Amino acid sequence: MKDILNLVTDVYKKSKLFFIGSMDENDFPNIKVVFPVKERTSLKEIYFSTNTSSKHAVQYRRNPKACVYFLKFIKGRGVLLTGKMEVLETQEIKNHFWNKGDTKYYPKGVTDPDYCILKFTPICGRYYHRYKSVDFKV
C-alpha cells in the first residue's frame, strides 16, 4: 500500500491540471478543470482557489461529495480520488494561499469577496497506469 501511495503522490506533485467533480441540483455530475494552489504538501488535504460565485462552490455548499482527477499524461498515469470538498472563506486561509498573479482572476486582491479556497479531503482513490488500476484508501 505504501508503494501505491508514493506513486500517487508523485503524480499529484507533478500534475499541471486537475479535474474536480461536483453534483448539480438534479444530482448529475459536473466536471471542471482547475489549477491547484502552488503549495502541495499532502494527499490528505488538496487545495484549489476558485470564485466564490462559481457554480461548483455553490454545489459543494449544497452537497460536499466530490471527486478529483489528475494525471501525468506522458507516463500514462492517472489518479481518481473521491471524498468531500469544503468551501473556505476565512481571511486567514485566503492570505495563506494568495499569490501575486491571482489578481488576474480576483481583481480586488486577497480580500476579494469572490475569492475562496476549496479544500478537498479524499477518502479513497484509484490509481491507473497503462491498462491496470489499483484501488486504495487515503
Task: Describe each model-derived feature in a short phrase.
Residues 10-25, 66-70:
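A short, Trp-centered hydrophobic/proline-enriched beta-strand micro-motif
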Residues 1-6, 50-56, 102-104:
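Charged, amphipathic alpha-helical segments
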Residues 18-48:
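N-terminal leader/targeting helix
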